[in-house]
A protein has these predicted regions:
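Transmembrane alpha-helix entry/boundary detector in multi-pass membrane proteins
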Residues: 40-61, 120-124
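Helix-to-loop junction signature of class
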Residues: 29-40, 102-109
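Cytosolic juxtamembrane helix at the C-terminal end of the final transmembrane segment
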Residues: 4-6, 69-84, 130-159
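Cytosolic juxtamembrane helix and N-cap/initiation of the first transmembrane helix
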Residues: 1-36, 46-51, 158-159
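Alpha-helical membrane-associated segments of multi-pass integral membrane proteins
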Residues: 15-23, 98, 102-146
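Alpha-helical rod/repeat scaffolding segments in eukaryotic adaptors/tethers
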Residues: 7, 45, 83-87, 113-120
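Loop-to-transmembrane helix junctions at the membrane interface
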Residues: 67-99, 103
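Generic alpha-helical transmembrane segments
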Residues: 53-71, 98, 126-129
Length: 159
């Protein structure tokens, strides 16, 4: 039982680290894209609308990246034995749900898209993130069950 618990803890630490870096990479990639490639707007769009749209987009990407980092840090902490609330698993579930939707939309775009290689690479990256989020969810639930079972065995009854 202890070996299984250790393996799950290591998996949580590893996948949590992966999600943290995925969140950081998402923000860095987005920022570099804006800096080096700029943002395309319709010619009729006013400068104020362009600025507002850019700011809202930056804030949204920053929030999403922060959520990935939050889930990653929480998974690492749980893997290291710290008690974490269920909130990070709920956030992880929402991120996973939206990532699955994005993968489906990318698959549809693959049918009608022009830049097929870019779409395929993006799908692979998003699928990898979805696997990491799934692993965090599964391993966290397993670890909580093992720890709960251990507490019950130590006390002799369920609290």
């Amino acid at each position: 039982m202890s070996a299984i618990k250790n393996k799950i803890e290591i998996n949580l630490i590893t996948t949590g680290t992966g999600l943290m870096f995925f969140g950081l990479w998402t923000f860095i990639k987005f920022f570099l894209t804006i800096v080096f490639l700029g943002v395309e707007y319709d010619d009729n769009t006013s400068d104020e609308v362009k600025l507002i749209a850019t700011i809202i987009t930056i804030i949204a990407v920053a929030i999403i990246s922060a959520l990935f980092c939050y889930v990653g840090l929480s998974a690492r902490a749980e893997g290291k034995g710290k008690k974490k609330s269920v909130v990070y698993l709920i956030v992880n579930g929402f991120l996973l749900f939206f990532h699955i939707l994005i993968i489906i939309l990318e698959a549809v775009a693959l049918l009608f898209g022009e830049n097929i290689l870019t779409i395929i690479i993006t799908m692979i990256i998003d699928a990898t993130a979805a696997v990491l989020m799934s692993e965090v969810m599964i391993n966290s639930i397993k670890l909580r069950k093992i720890r709960r079972h251990k507490r019950i065995m130590e006390v002799g009854y369920e609290l």
